[in-house]
């Protein structure tokens, strides 16, 4: 359709952005009037999609010059039941508008100014600036348009196209240019703005920083510096890296392929991304180890309470690294319940060595490619987590934490655990192959540390490569110290509260631990301390806001006292005080015994209940018991049947026995309940109740021997938390018991038993510790 004067065209009113002839613009449609115009005139099937872009400069005024535009694309979509539109338009002509009666207007005059320019100096400046813009254009199409206008000497249109790329110009400046009278005026304005903004970064085309060629201001031609393209910059980075011969041949072969490719080829970007990854990896960058054992001991002592055995083992490891000047062959694995400081002690190791710390979470990973990357032939292929982490930390010898290594899963996509074998094997990891990188990378300088909650879930081959360091839960005394020395300070700092404003009494900490937490670590305890700090912050803020002009706090008692008596008012509905098993089940009937078990979150007391009824000696088990636990019941029953006459115990041969372990929804398994099951059956046979203040743990044999078990400290701490005072342990676990803190050993009456007879005797007599209480 030919645009003529006195035509009536639909109007789109805009308040930002100016469409110049020859330029394109995307216009989001927001106003109801514009939406009505589009739905009335543009949504119909028609090839004559022309509009007038009018510019609203104030509430009641529209600029006298508008732009006639062709609607190239119309986008429409629905969001929250509302229809939205967007227009892609191309500027055609300037136009004076008359009789603006929305939604249409009458075009009174079409302005196509392209007069000849007599000022040769101005032409030279304009052409030079336009060529610079074209040389750094993001598209070939735009460059061709620039050179086409130069060849055709369409200097007015050339000025329009150049100004359309100047993002630094404001709305009113662009309107002034749109309404300028004559080509000379527009060219002069274009040159003026070019000279004012000599930094090419101000253009929408985002010219690289290295281009310092400003537009000429004195009429003289200046030499435009050579702008290095992306491939040349990449080659410079690669030349600065010392590769091995094998890697160097592969890298430069791929670089040569890249240079011979056209940028439009599909493999160009894939190869470019691969080379950029290669150039960004720390092939030769290492941090210098600064291992001072005295400094390391200080860091470990200040950052962690208790765990003396663990800290000593870490110091031994650091001493070997210092003597050897190498970390090859030693991969530590901290195992224990959540929240006891496995990750933080790994950070302390990195700090004491002067190395960077990098953590990779492996929890829930099922795909081998997450570890070793995807092959480059796949769409959206990317390197594995190991290579990505090295790219992030920018050094090839960080302390690398493989967190939650026991949470790896095997599936149809391969075994992530198996993928770790090459990474953790000192004989192989000097040539670690990531599928995406596909060239050997030396990870032997990395100090690997793993963490796990349940070491039994690790595959044997992976476990064989790890040096296991067991970390147990904290006692009440240790938790109190941790809260006073670490948690409280951290939470006060986080909430911007001075130590002078709050005092957390020790008894309040004890109350939080005993009544609000049930954990081996201190995570829930820290959350409770955070809740107290938030309450204190609220009280302080309310006091300050009571008088906005006050420079000091109003009269209030400082520090704010947090005691055992008022802590329940602060934590409120977070109060989850549990009824202790001892109090709930006292007095114990015959056939009931307290056993001890250990889980990934710490130890717990496990009641064992047995009942009998007339029958034929059948055994019924309930409580979601595993195979090993069921076999322990049979062993205990077999020992009782074989020794009842010798020991003068009752018999259960003509009785049906029902054994139940409460919390039926929880899986239970393991051999350590053997002694507890034997005690429950003996109590049932003799009709004599067992002690209600004692718990027992240990595996039994058919000949009556008590065999060692694991998790001694966690089980003793669980008994202590529940108010039990006597614990019967296997004699074989005496060494683990003696390593426990003296305050725990003095508070608890621990009996070491070698046979089932010893266990039964300890579970039925009086406790000397209980007598003192």
From Swiss-Prot:
Positions of the Lon proteolytic domain: 587-766
This protein's record includes keyword Amino-acid biosynthesis: no
What InterPro entries has UniProt attached to this entry? AAA+_ATPase, ATPase_AAA_core, Lon_bac/euk-typ, Lon_lid, Lon_proteolytic, Lon_Prtase, Lon_prtase_N, Lon_prtase_N_sf
GO MF assignments: ATP binding; ATP hydrolysis activity; ATP-dependent peptidase activity; serine-type endopeptidase activity
Residue ranges constituting the Lon N-terminal domain according to the UniProt record: 9-198
Task: Specify one Pfam family.
Answer: Lon_lid
Provide a GO biological process annotation.
protein processing
According to its UniProt record, the EC number is 3.4.21.53
Tell me which HAMAP family the record gives.
Answer: lonp2_euk (MF_03121)
> Family, per the entry?
Belongs to the peptidase S16 family.
Q: What is this protein called?
A: Lon protease homolog 2, peroxisomal
Per the UniProt record, the source organism is Caenorhabditis elegans
């Amino acid at each position: 359709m030919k645009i003529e004067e006195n035509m009536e065209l639909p109007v789109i009113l805009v308040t930002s952005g100016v469409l110049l002839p020859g330029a394109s613009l995307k216009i989001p449609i927001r106003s109801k009037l514009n939406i009505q115009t589009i739905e009335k005139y543009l949504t119909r099937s028609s090839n004559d999609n022309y509009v007038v872009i009018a510019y609203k400069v104030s509430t009641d005024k529209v600029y006298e010059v508008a732009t006639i535009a062709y609607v190239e694309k119309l986008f429409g979509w629905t969001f929250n039941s509302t229809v939205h539109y967007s227009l892609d338009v191309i500027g055609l002509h300037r136009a004076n508008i008359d009789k603006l009666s929305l939604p249409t207007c009458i075009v009174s005059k079409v302005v196509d100014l392209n007069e000849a320019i007599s000022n040769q100096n101005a032409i030279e400046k304009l052409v030079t600036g336009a060529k610079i813009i074209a040389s750094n254009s993001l598209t070939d199409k735009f460059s061709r348009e620039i050179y086409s206008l130069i060849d055709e000497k369409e200097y007015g249109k050339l000025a329009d196209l150049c100004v359309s790329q100047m993002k630094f110009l404001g709305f009113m400046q662009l309107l002034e240019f749109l309404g300028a009278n004559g080509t000379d005026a527009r060219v002069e304005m274009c040159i003026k703005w070019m000279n004012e903004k000599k930094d090419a970064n101000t253009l929408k085309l985002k010219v690289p920083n290295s281009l310092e060629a400003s537009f000429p201001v004195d009429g003289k031609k200046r030499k435009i510096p050579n702008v290095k393209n992306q491939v040349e910059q990449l080659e410079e980075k690669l030349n600065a890296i010392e590769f091995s011969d094998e890697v160097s041949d592969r890298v430069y072969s791929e670089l040569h392929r890249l240079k011979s490719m056209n940028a439009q080829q599909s493999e160009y970007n894939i190869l470019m991304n691969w080379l950029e990854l290669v150039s960004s990896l720390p092939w030769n960058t290492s941090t210098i180890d600064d291992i001072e054992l005295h400094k390391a001991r200080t860091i470990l002592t200040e950052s962690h309470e208790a765990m003396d055995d663990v800290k000593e083992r870490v110091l031994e490891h650091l001493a070997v690294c210092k003597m050897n000047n190498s970390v090859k062959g030693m991969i530590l694995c901290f195992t224990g319940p959540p929240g006891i400081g496995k990750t933080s002690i790994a950070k302390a190791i990195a700090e004491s060595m002067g190395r960077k710390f990098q953590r990779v979470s492996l929890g829930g990973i099922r795909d081998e490619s997450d570890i070793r990357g995807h092959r480059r032939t796949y769409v959206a292929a990317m390197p594995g987590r190991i290579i990505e982490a090295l790219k992030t930390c920018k050094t090839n010898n960080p302390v690398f934490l493989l967190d939650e290594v026991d949470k790896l899963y095997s599936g149809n996509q391969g075994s992530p655990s198996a993928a770790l074998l090459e990474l953790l094997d000192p004989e192989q990891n000097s040539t670690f192959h990531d599928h995406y990188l596909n060239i050997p990378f030396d990870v032997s300088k990395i100090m690997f540390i793993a963490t796990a909650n349940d070491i039994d879930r690790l595959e044997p081959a992976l476990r064989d490569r790890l040096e296991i360091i067991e970390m147990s839960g904290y006692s009440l005394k240790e938790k109190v110290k941790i809260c006073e020395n670490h948690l409280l300070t951290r939470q006060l700092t986080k909430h911007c509260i001075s130590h002078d404003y709050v005092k957390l009494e020790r008894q309040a900490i004890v109350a939080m631990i005993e009544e609000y937490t049930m954990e081996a670590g201190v995570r829930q305890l820290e959350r409770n301390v955070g809740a107290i700090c938030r309450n204190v912050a609220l009280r302080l803020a309310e006091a300050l806001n009571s008088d906005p002009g006050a420079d000091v706090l109003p009269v209030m008692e400082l520090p704010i006292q947090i005691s055992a008596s008022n802590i329940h008012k602060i934590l409120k509905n977070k109060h989850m005080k549990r009824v202790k098993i001892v109090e709930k089940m006292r007095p114990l009937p015959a056939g009931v015994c307290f056993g001890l078990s250990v889980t990934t979150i710490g130890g717990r007391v496990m009641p064992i209940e047995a009942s009998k009824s007339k029958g034929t000696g059948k055994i019924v088990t309930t409580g979601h018991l595993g195979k090993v636990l069921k076999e322990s019941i049979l062993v205990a029953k077999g020992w009782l049947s074989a020794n009842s006459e010798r020991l003068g115990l009752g018999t259960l041969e003509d009785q049906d026995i029902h054994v139940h372990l409460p919390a039926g929804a929880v899986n239970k398994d393991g051999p350590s309940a053997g002694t507890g099951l034997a005690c429950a059956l003996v109590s049932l046979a003799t009709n004599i109740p067992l002690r209600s203040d004692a718990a027992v743990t240990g595996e039994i044999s058919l000949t009556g021997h008590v065999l060692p078990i694991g998790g001694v400290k966690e089980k003793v701490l669980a008994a202590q938390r529940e108010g039990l005072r006597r614990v019967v342990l296997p004699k074989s676990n005496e060494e683990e018991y003696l390593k426990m803190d003296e305050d725990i050993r003095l508070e608890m009456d621990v009996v070491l038993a070698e046979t089932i007879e010893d266990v039964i005797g300890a579970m039925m007599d009086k406790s000397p510790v209980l007598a003192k209480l």
